[in-house]
Curated annotation (Swiss-Prot):
UniProt name for this protein: ATP phosphoribosyltransferase regulatory subunit
Subunit structure: Heteromultimer composed of HisG and HisZ subunits.
Organism: Burkholderia vietnamiensis (strain G4 / LMG 22486) (Burkholderia cepacia (strain R1808))
Coiled-coil spans in chain: none
The entry's keywords: Amino-acid biosynthesis, Cytoplasm, Histidine biosynthesis
Main location: cytoplasm
Subcellular location: Cytoplasm
Name of encoding gene: hisZ
Annotated pathway: Amino-acid biosynthesis; L-histidine biosynthesis; L-histidine from 5-phospho-alpha-D-ribose 1-diphosphate: step 1/9
One GO location term (cellular component): cytoplasm
Pfam families with a match to the protein in the record: tRNA-synt_His
Annotated family: Belongs to the class-II aminoacyl-tRNA synthetase family. HisZ subfamily.
Gene3D superfamilies per UniProt: Bira Bifunctional Protein, Domain 2
Organism lineage string: Bacteria, Pseudomonadati, Pseudomonadota, Betaproteobacteria, Burkholderiales
Keyword match Transferase: no
């Protein structure tokens, strides 16, 4: 076996890709900061039970596990940063009001999410804690769309769903609630025959409502159909009202509603929003409300947020990260050194050509040169 081979679905990030990823990371974190989000940096490694407080069986399967040589306890390499941020909010910050936090860091997955997906993602996201109202969801949705526009993406489609609809239907029917996981699988997979089989012996109202969910998809007008076909329950009315406001606030993007798109249902407690772009089959960003995320840490605060994979974003983003630079000669000259230092202090990239390598081009576009004219070092176009 060659010593330079990497594990499957693990890859090096080479200069051009790394530069683009870093450019996008800086843009997004700066935008998060402009909204008032504070950055946190949780550790890559934690005790397993701390990492698996939410997310269910899927998160457990995706988490790498190893034994701590100091304590003998089982550790996990994080597969999702969101639970870590919830821990920070609950125990380390322990604030009473609204807290806005953001992050960017590597996560590891035991299995890739798709055929060509990496098992080492760079997750970036933002979270609001402490406000149960829809205003927080509206802000997070706007920030997510803002981030995608900053990355140069267009023709964005925003898919909306709400965990409260299914939760309300199950809460009114104990028999349906006992089959909750199977119903969730059938709805998420749009498996109508299985759904009919699972609902045959349920009450008429619950049966009709559950069977209607796979057909309640389309543009925002489908919410009117949902009001007509679903039971008039306060939780369902509130969920549909929330989706209507989220749809109306999403300016400049295509909006779709799918009341059976319940991926992440076990994790979310309210509105869920997912962003897609043309030509990319998988979601590029996901977000939503998860008010119970801090419960395992003894402090279940209202919470909503979103995240995306920076490596995938860089792959599809048209943002050009190949920077321009100034080419300077290499010489032991105090005036040259002072000129180079001044340019770098001003934010310019200055590359000094090492002796014998003047003809070698790197990935920076050297569109200017630092040359000596009449005893002074000046920048000229190349």
């Amino acid at each position: 076996m060659s010593t330079w081979l990497l594990p499957e679905n693990i890859a090096d990030v080479l200069p051009s890709e790394a530069r683009k990823i870093e450019e996008l990371r800086r843009r997004l974190l700066d935008r998060f900061r402009s909204y008032g989000y504070e950055m946190v940096m949780p550790p890559l490694l934690e005790y397993l039970e701390s990492l698996l407080t939410s997310g269910g069986a899927d998160l457990r399967l995706r988490t790498f596990k190893l034994v701590d040589q100091l304590s003998g306890r089982t550790l996990g390499l994080r597969a999702d940063i969101t639970p870590q941020v919830a821990r920070i909010d609950a125990h380390l910050l322990n604030r009473q009001g609204v807290t806005r936090l953001c992050y960017a860091g590597h996560v590891m997955h035991t299995r890739p999410r798709g055929l060509h997906a990496t098992r080492e993602q760079i997750q970036i996201g933002a979270e609001i804690y402490g406000h149960a109202g829809l205003e927080a969801d509206l802000e997070i949705q706007q920030l997510m769309l803002d981030a995608l526009h900053l990355a140069g993406l267009s023709r964005i489609r925003l898919d909306l769903c709400h965990a409260g609809v299914l939760a309300a239907l199950l809460a009114r029917d104990a028999q349906a609630a006992a089959r909750g996981e199977a119903l969730y699988d059938a709805l998420s997979g749009k498996d109508v025959p299985l759904l009919h089989e699972l609902t045959d012996d349920l009450g008429a109202d619950t049966r009709a409502a559950l069977r209607a969910l796979p057909h309640l998809y389309g543009d925002a007008s489908v919410l009117d159909e949902a009001r007509a076909r679903l039971p008039v329950l306060p939780e369902i009315t509130r969920a549909l009202d929330d989706l209507a406001q989220l749809a109306a606030s999403a300016k400049g993007v295509e909006v779709a509603v799918d009341l059976a798109d319940l991926r992440g249902y076990a994790y979310h407690s309210g509105a869920m929003f997912t962003a897609y772009i043309d030509g990319v089959p998988n979601a590029i960003a996901r977000g939503g409300r998860y008010d119970h995320v801090g419960q395992a840490y003894g402090r279940a605060r209202p919470a909503t947020g979103f995240s995306l994979d920076l490596r995938e974003l860089a792959r599809i983003s048209p943002v050009e990260a190949r920077g321009t630079a100034i080419l300077a000669p290499w010489a032991q000259d105090d005036a040259l050194s002072a000129a180079v230092a001044a340019l770098r202090d001003a934010g310019e990239v200055v590359i000094q050509a090492l002796p014998g390598h003047d003809h070698v081009l790197d990935e920076f576009a050297c569109d200017r040169s630092l040359v000596e004219r009449a005893g002074a070092w000046v920048v000229e176009p190349r």
